[in-house]
Structures are given as structure tokens and as C-alpha cells.
């Protein structure tokens, strides 16, 4: 699959039937390592690969409380959650957030290429970041905060090219 095929086939997958193999997970992580980071400050981002079902369950529960929805399942019973954390202190721009989002998108596109299900996770990550006890369980390096993440795993869903409507995002041209 070429890059544009992966981009046009990408979708949020929320149904999983197993964990990625070690080789698949390493490929997904390699895509993260290939992501651009502002001013090449790679020491300002950190990945946490969580496959501990108990911890994923705690994050899911924190999100239920955060959204005041006891029926919510924002982690979708995923076997793996990859959290991207960053150093936010001392910044007054959006570079740390952009770095993390770019890292996640690279991992998602690699997952598409591998036929793995993947989905950006924002809400549960926000809930996690507001829960000091859960953040402590992550053993993040000093000064790092959870920013965004993705879930990934085996799926029976198939990626096929989607019709991408032009004009979906308002676009202005300045000549």
C-alpha cells in the first residue's frame, strides 16, 4: 500500500480481536520514531506502550467519570494503548501538541499499512491527564504530561479506499 492509499483508506477502528504481534508493534513504534518533532527536540516527547488490561480498564473508568457517562467505553476494549506525553511547561505555543498528534498519525498510518485496527484517543487521554493517581502509575519522566494517544490491535475490519468529499474542510486560496 502506498502512502496515499493508506491515507485515503484510514478510518477509526474500534473493534479488536487480539493484540498486535511484537513485530507489528515494533513497526508501529518505528513510524512514531520517524515523525517530525519541532526543532528536533525528541527529548520533549515520550511514548508509553500499555498492554496491561487492568490499567487500560482504569483509564476507561476515569473517562466514564470524566464524561459523566457510566456506559461509555472510550478505550473500546483495545489490547494496546500507546500514550504520547510531552513537556508542556515553559511553552506558549502549540508545538508540543502538534508533535504528539503527528507522532500518533504516523503510528495510525503504519497500522493501516499493517492491517491493524487503530484509533486516535483524545477524550480518555484528557481524562487520564486529569487523574493524578493514574498519571503516577505511568511512571512518566519528570515534567512530562499525557497529551494524546492511540489504541491498536488486530481487527477483522478491512481498509478500503473511501470517497473523500472535496470541501469537507473549508479551504481558502490566497493568490
PLM regions and their residue ranges:
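N-terminal amphipathic, basic helical "cap/leader" segment at the start of enzyme domains
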Residues: 1-80, 174-175
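C-terminal helix-cap and adjacent tail motif
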Residues: 3-12, 17, 21, 140, ...
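Generic beta-strand structural signal
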Residues: 80, 114, 146-148
Amino acid at each position: 500500500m502506498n502512502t496515499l492509499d493508506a491515507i485515503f483508506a484510514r478510518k477509526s477502528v474500534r473493534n479488536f480481536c487480539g493484540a498486535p504481534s511484537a513485530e507489528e508493534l515494533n513497526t508501529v513504534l518505528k513510524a512514531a520514531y520517524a515523525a517530525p518533532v519541532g526543532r528536533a527536540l525528541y527529548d520533549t516527547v515520550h511514548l508509553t506502550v500499555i498492554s496491561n488490561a487492568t490499567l487500560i480498564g482504569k483509564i476507561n473508568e476515569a473517562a466514564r467519570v470524566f464524561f459523566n457517562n457510566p456506559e461509555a467505553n472510550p478505550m473500546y476494549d483495545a489490547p494496546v494503548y500507546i500514550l504520547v506525553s510531552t513537556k508542556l511547561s515553559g511553552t506558549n505555543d502549540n508545538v508540543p501538541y502538534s508533535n504528539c498528534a503527528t507522532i500518533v498519525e504516523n503510528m495510525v498510518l503504519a497500522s493501516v499499512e499493517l492491517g491493524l485496527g487503530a484509533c486516535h484517543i483524545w477524550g480518555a487521554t484528557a481524562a487520564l491527564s486529569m487523574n493524578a493517581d493514574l498519571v503516577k502509575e505511568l511512571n512518566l519522566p519528570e515534567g512530562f504530561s499525557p497529551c494524546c494517544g492511540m489504541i491498536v490491535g488486530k481487527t477483522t475490519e478491512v481498509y478500503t479506499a473511501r470517497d473523500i468529499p472535496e470541501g469537507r474542510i473549508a479551504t481558502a486560496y490566497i493568490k
